[in-house]
Structure formats: structure tokens, C-alpha cells
Design a protein with these regions (language model features):
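C-terminal and inter-domain tail/linker signature
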Residues: 1-133
Length: 133
């Protein structure tokens, strides 16, 4: 696994799951950090400040990295997050841009809630369309 992929995964596991934001940033984030997530300010300080409240609201965090894909200096990480014993479940897709040293310098994400299958499909029905013979 490349250094930039390791650094992207490190932010998830060490910063978000384990709560070791400063340590993860020191080893994985570049000098500048541009954040495109709603409510999260740019910079290492903004990232760290956001997670102070996040950790209070979600003291139990389990992160499962499903897959990591690279394209040049971009790293895409597909993640399942289980918060507070499954009280909140999120599926996220994150895009990280790395600098020439493999350190993370920019981040985008898409987040959706995840519910058990019975909740998703309990009132949903699907019928195959009719096709001409």
C-alpha cells in the first residue's frame, strides 16, 4: 500500500476511530489542509476543533474501511462507520488529495446514513417492467 493510502486510512483509524487527532495529523497531514466537508473549517486546527464536539456526541466509534483506491495523487476511501454501538451508522466515500510526499492536503466526502435492510425495504416494492414479446 502506498504512503498516501496509508495516510488517508491513518486519518480514519487513528484520528476518528481512536481519537488521536494530533498524532494522526502529525504523521499524515501536510503543511496545509483544505477541507470541503460542511461545518469543518480548513486547516489542521479546524479539523481538530470539529472533532472535539464529534467525540463528545459519539464516544463509541468503530470504523470499517471497505476499500481504498488510488488515482494519481487522489485516494478514495469507502468506509462504514458504526457510532455509539450502532445507534448511528454511516457510509462514507472520502476523496483525499496528497502532496508530493504522500501527505494529505485536501479532503472531500459524501456521507449517507445506513439502516438495517429491513428499514430500507420494508415499505418498498419493485416490479419488473413488462417487455414486448
Amino acid at each position: 500500500m502506498s504512503l498516501q493510502s496509508q495516510n488517508a486510512q491513518n486519518l480514519y483509524i487513528h484520528a476518528i476511530q481512536d481519537g488521536r487527532v494530533a498524532e494522526a495529523q502529525a504523521s499524515s497531514v501536510g503543511d496545509t489542509y483544505i477541507q470541503h466537508s460542511t461545518g469543518v473549517p480548513d486547516g489542521k486546527e479546524g479539523f481538530a476543533a470539529f472533532f472535539v464536539d464529534f467525540f463528545k456526541r459519539h464516544p463509541e466509534r468503530e470504523i470499517k474501511i471497505v476499500r481504498t483506491i488510488e488515482d494519481g495523487n487522489l485516494v478514495f476511501v469507502h468506509v462504514h462507520q458504526y457510532l455509539n454501538g450502532g445507534e448511528a451508522q454511516w457510509v462514507t466515500t472520502d476523496t483525499f488529495r496528497a502532496d508530493e510526499n504522500g501527505r494529505i492536503v485536501e479532503h472531500w466526502d459524501v456521507i449517507t446514513t445506513s439502516a438495517p435492510n429491513w428499514r430500507l425495504f420494508s415499505s418498498w416494492s419493485y416490479r419488473l417492467p413488462s417487455f414486448p414479446p
